[in-house]
Amino acid sequence: IELDRDLVVGLKKRFSHQSKFSLREGDVLSAPLEAENGLTINKVVANIPYNITGPLLKRLIGELRKAPENRFETLVLLMQKEVAQRLIALPGTSNFSALSVRIQLLAKCQDVCDVPSKCFQPAPKVDSKVVMIKPFVSSEPDFYEIGNLLEKLLKHAFAGRRKKLRNTIGSFV
């Protein structure tokens, strides 16, 4: 799904002969995620506009309290490096955040490679990173039912970055 009409024309010229390549013009945040030809889309490869990374991730892999509208096996996404580092951050590291917990409860995230800003024309002000995301398949409705509770816990747990966890969640418990 591509919003830029000029890019759509170029992509169609370059990839239209690929039988497994599907391109639709539109806004990825509102366009249907199903294939137009009735086939199942199970992989997504995308260069995400940095300003819609959060909403797009919610749409593609779901939220703690809401299952995604489609189930994708694999997402390979190019995104702003700082956001990607938070997605893949491990507990105890400086990039570990509520976003890290949310995403890692929903999917396995793997660092693929860095992409310096100089690789783009025009060059953005920030570097990028490619991340592979493999969403977990949960058919358990209980998982999504406790999502609101998990969201509240995360809000309290990460409210004071330098505070001890027992102090920040004291009011939660």
For each predicted feature, which ranges?
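Catalytic cores of RNA-modifying enzymes
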Residues: 1-156, 160
